[in-house]
Amino acid sequence: MADRDDERHAERDRDELVAQVSYLEKELSVLRRKLADSPRHVRLLEDRLQEAQTALAAANAKNERLVSALKEARDQIVALKEEVDRLSQPPSGFGVFLRARDDGTVEIFTNGRKMRVNVSPSVNVDELRPGQEVMLNEAFNVVEASSYETVGEVVMLKEILEDGERVLVISNHDEERIVRIAEPLRDEPLRAGDSLLLEPRSGYVYERIPKAEVEELILEEVPDISYSDIGGLNGQIEMIRDAVELPYLHKELFREHKLRPPKGVLLYGPPGCGKTLIAKAVANSLAKQVAEKTGRDVGKSFFLNIKGPELLNKYVGETERHIRLVFQRAREKASEGTPVIVFFDEMDSIFRTRGSGVSSDVENTIVPQLLSEIDGVEGLENVIVIGASNREDMIDPAILRPGRLDVKIKIERPDAEAARDIFSKYITPDLPLHPDDLAEHGGSPTATVNAMIQRVVERMYAETEENRFLEVTYANGDKEVLYFKDFNSGAMIQNIVDRAKKMAIKDYLENGSKGLRVSHLLQACVDEFSENEDLPNTTNPDDWARISGKKGERIVYIRTLVSGKKGADAGRSIDTVANTGQYL
């Protein structure tokens, strides 16, 4: 029984082992199949991993784009919100600050009303200045400081009131108004006659406007013309130096001798003889004398060149205003101790004899204005008036009387000696001289130049047939022959030299022969005479004679003695001559 049980147990164990072996064989077979499939599976997993990584990178890039778009959208929303808030704000107005009060409020002027308002804590009240613009919110409180007004009306200052903060001005319609002085003008010296910028609503003047038409009358500070540059006028130069420089340089001596210095000088004579040059040389000489007297390296003087016709204005009172401003400018400069020359060129054009009927009678108000200004110079040092004219007979006698234009100096046409002196200013030894001319004088440039000047002066001043210019008939029947020398001037001499130099340049360009020759000067002299032969044409020979410097018996007839280009002499009668407007 026991054996049978053992057999059954052994058989059962054997079956279990067989089953276990069969199971393991199956498992082994499965594992072998899986092992055979594992490389392909690994590759598949690797491919899936790479695809997943690529998808992840794309997702990250998309996420970044979304973040950027969201940020941009948020910024746009913020900007739009700010724009909406800004556009929805009420408009800000502007006002003009008047003054601050002790309680922290300020007074402003806006929309035609004077208001007392509060100030934002961001605005420093102590930095606000009268007349300054300020920005206002909807409650008219000051929230920001602005600048000053830059546009408005131009008015003329008439008077500064006693408080120094207000002025009396005159508008373009001759209306008087009292206005306040804004801060930018508080420290500037204001004078009657100044042009100011007015903002009419607030009543503040902000700026002084320079008058361009008056500034243009000022030619230069120190002219570069000296007495050594002027030839043939030594006597006149000595006279004007005595009249102008002595009183300025030796004030004590004049005061000791109770001698009043002259207030004005009149330079008169034919055109082109050096009147303007002398006036400029006076200013230059005074500047040098000031430098020596004060010990400075550079002297200073002012030369106010007033061109007569430029002063005239079609509006009533404008010419007089210009004259006042000119003398006001002279007083300003002279108050600094600087000599000032006020030079009126072509004085007869604006200061004609009153009531003469030869103009529009504008001189009836202009002449008194000048007289009052000249008389006003009496108590003012360092200012002298110099007038120049070639028709001194047309200037109002009140201007020429002693005490106004005290010294009268006639600038004559140059004689032969004066002409040599003038030529020496333009023909100098340092110029290129032709070798042939140099050889004739031993190679000496100085001797050559002197010989050239002597030859051309002899040609100009010879009373020969070829130099005969005019025959004039006087009212008493007398006749006189005038030569070209009778109409010579410094300007004509300069023109002759310029012509000769141009001829020398053309000769050098054409044939290579360089240098100035005496033949150039002689030919230039002939050409200059030929050009001027047709100039004495006028309906009134007597007026022409006065301008040309020929005074005396009235001239009734002029006949030219120079053969014209057509070879015919032509007598010119006062009844038949056409007025060309040209004068010799």
Curated annotation (Swiss-Prot):
Gene Ontology CC entries for this record: proteasome complex
Residue segments, region Docks into pockets in the proteasome alpha-ring: 583-584
GO biological process, one term: modification-dependent protein catabolic process
Coiled coil regions, renumbered to chain: 8-90
Role played: ATPase which is responsible for recognizing, binding, unfolding and translocation of pupylated proteins into the bacterial 20S proteasome core particle. May be essential for opening the gate of the 20S proteasome via an interaction with its C-terminus, thereby allowing substrate entry and access to the site of proteolysis. Thus, the C-termini of the proteasomal ATPase may function like a 'key in a lock' to induce gate opening and therefore regulate proteolysis.
Subunit: Homohexamer. Assembles into a hexameric ring structure that caps the 20S proteasome core. Strongly interacts with the prokaryotic ubiquitin-like protein Pup through a hydrophobic interface; the interacting region of ARC lies in its N-terminal coiled-coil domain. There is one Pup binding site per ARC hexamer ring. Upon ATP-binding, the C-terminus of ARC interacts with the alpha-rings of the proteasome core, possibly by binding to the intersubunit pockets.
Listed name of the protein: Proteasome-associated ATPase
Source species of the chain: Thermobifida fusca (strain YX)
